[in-house]
């Protein structure tokens, strides 16, 4: 743990007019530091470490989807959480990725200071790079505390982002199949 991070949290408490010596706040700087390091531990990981060789030969060339992957991230503008789900698909070309690796890739990028638009693209690009897939699709739907707790204070708003690569971008049929399978299409 960075030795200066707890002191910075203590300084924040002082700037807010709080007494960091009162009973409820005595260990808050240390706890907040540990929490922030956990919430941002994606910076200490790489896609290569996560995949760890879990690519398996396969003659499957049909769509693979992992949906409803819970994600928690911090908005890079306000350091407030956004919480949602990722839906990830790819079309294999000779190899498939270990199932848990997709969720771990989502987590790695989510555990960084982010904006949802970049998070969606980073997930898609990394899965494309690792698998060499014929196409990758990522849809993320999330609620942003920076919009719910402050600013416009819209409690029921949800942000949706998508990135479509390869076959998902080039073929409306493939894209629609994915969106229908994750329950996101309107017919």
From Swiss-Prot:
GO CC aspect terms: cytoplasm
Alphabetized Pfam families for the sequence: GTP_cyclohydroI
Biochemical pathway: Cofactor biosynthesis; 7,8-dihydroneopterin triphosphate biosynthesis; 7,8-dihydroneopterin triphosphate from GTP: step 1/1
Transmembrane segments: none
A single BP term in Gene Ontology: tetrahydrofolate biosynthetic process
Record keyword Hydrolase present: yes
The protein's enzyme class: hydrolase
Keywords carried by this UniProt record: GTP-binding, Hydrolase, Nucleotide-binding, One-carbon metabolism
Catalytic function, reaction form: GTP + H2O = 7,8-dihydroneopterin 3'-triphosphate + formate + H(+)
SUPFAM superfamilies: Tetrahydrobiopterin biosynthesis enzymes-like
InterPro entries: GTP-CH-I_C/QueF, GTP-CH-I_N, GTP_CycHdrlase_I, GTP_CycHdrlase_I_CS, GTP_CycHdrlase_I_dom
The EC number(s) this enzyme carries: 3.5.4.16
The UniProt record lists the keyword Phosphoprotein: no
HAMAP family according to UniProt: FolE (MF_00223)
Assembly and interaction partners: Homomer.
Family: Belongs to the GTP cyclohydrolase I family.
Protein name, as recorded: GTP cyclohydrolase 1 1
Organism phylogeny: Bacteria, Pseudomonadati, Pseudomonadota, Gammaproteobacteria, Pseudomonadales
């Amino acid at each position: 743990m960075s030795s200066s991070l707890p002191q910075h949290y203590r300084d924040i408490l002082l700037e807010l007019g709080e007494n960091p010596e009162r009973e409820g706040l005595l260990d808050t700087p240390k706890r907040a530091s540990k929490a922030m390091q956990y919430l941002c531990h994606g910076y200490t990981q790489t896609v290569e470490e996560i995949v760890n060789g879990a690519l398996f030969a396969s003659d499957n060339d049909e769509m693979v989807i992992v949906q409803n992957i819970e994600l928690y991230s911090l908005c890079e503008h306000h350091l407030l959480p956004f919480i949602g789900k990722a839906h990830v698909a790819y079309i294999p070309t000779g190899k498939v990725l270990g199932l848990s690796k997709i969720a771990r890739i989502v987590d790695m990028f989510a555990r960084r200071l982010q904006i949802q638009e970049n998070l969606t693209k980073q997930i898609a690009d990394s899965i494309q790079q690792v698998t060499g897939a014929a196409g990758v699709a990522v849809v993320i739907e999330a609620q942003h505390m920076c919009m719910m707790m402050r600013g416009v204070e819209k409690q029921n708003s949800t942000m949706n982002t998508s990135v479509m690569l390869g076959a998902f971008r080039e073929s409306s049929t493939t894209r629609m199949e994915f969106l229908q399978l994750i329950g996101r299409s309107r017919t």
